[in-house]
């Protein structure tokens, strides 16, 4: 398991070259003979779309997109099967975001990778995800396939999130669900559903009892008392 971090500006050691940064996990884990490490690094750079001319460059000499590519390449160095991507495109320009997302999908296809992709941008989530887990205050509220979530959201929080996503279709309007109330403290949560004080569908049971997990359909689960109605 490896990780790609959110901020490409702070996750790379400014005192090391790009080649040294990518080679570091190989040297620590001794997965390659020392004489083959540089060749492995150059191979990884080619897979990640980073020119070999940048081998001796430092992070401050690269733009944000190339830095994030280096972060992805470093994560690939040990041939992981599972990579956690923590908001990997949130600090990048939209055009660069698309390039990084396409790179991640290409690497997933060619290397058989599984991603845990964390994001608050639903358009990005829709583009890259096969299954989506929606969380509120650190707890699951809904999980299902990507298409199913956008077509048939069940939890009130999921519906509110999706209502805020812009639609690029002339003349089409979607009713925006505006949430009221303050976000409760995750440190000292009240009994019942954590979303109850902001939910337009909340009933007395929601404020008293934590909702169980209901199966809406095969592969589609939701934590909501109203899901059974």
Task: Give names to the regions the model predicted.
Residues 7, 39, 56-58, 174:
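Interfacial catalytic loop of ABC nucleotide-binding domains
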Residues 16-36, 47-49, 144:
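ABC-type ATPase nucleotide-binding domains, specifically the catalytic core motifs of the NBD
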Residues 36-53, 162-163:
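Conserved ABC ATPase "signature" region
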Residues 51, 143-229:
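Short catalytic/signature loops enriched in Gly
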Residues 58-62, 66:
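Conserved ABC ATPase signature
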Residues 77-81:
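A short, proline-enriched helix->beta-strand linker immediately N-terminal to the Walker B motif
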Residues 84, 88, 92, 96-174:
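P-loop NTP-binding/switch modules centered on Walker-like glycine-rich loops
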């Amino acid at each position: 398991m490896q990780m790609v971090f959110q901020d490409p500006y702070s996750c790379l050691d400014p005192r090391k070259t790009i080649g040294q940064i990518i080679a570091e996990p190989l040297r620590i884990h001794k997965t390659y003979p020392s004489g083959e490490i540089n060749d492995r690094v150059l191979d990884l750079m080619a897979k990640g779309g980073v020119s070999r001319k940048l081998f001796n460059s430092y992070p401050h000499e690269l733009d944000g997109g190339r830095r994030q590519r280096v972060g992805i390449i470093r994560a690939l160095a040990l041939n992981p099967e599972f990579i956690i991507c923590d908001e990997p495109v949130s600090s990048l320009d939209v055009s660069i975001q698309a390039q990084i997302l396409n790179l991640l999908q290409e690497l997933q296809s060619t290397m058989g990778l599984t991603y845990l992709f964390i994001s608050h941008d639903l358009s990005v989530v829709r583009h890259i995800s096969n299954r989506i887990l929606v969380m509120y205050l650190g707890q699951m509220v809904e999980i299902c396939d990507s298409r199913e979530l956008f077509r048939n959201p069940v939890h009130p929080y999921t519906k509110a999130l999706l209502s805020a996503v812009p639609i690029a279709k002339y003349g089409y309007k979607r009713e925006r669900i505006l949430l009221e109330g303050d976000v409760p403290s995750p440190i000292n949560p009240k009994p019942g559903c954590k979303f109850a004080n902001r939910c337009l569908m909340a009933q007395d049971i929601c404020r008293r009892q934590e909702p169980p997990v209901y199966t809406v359909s095969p592969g589609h689960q939701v934590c909501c008392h109203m899901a059974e109605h």
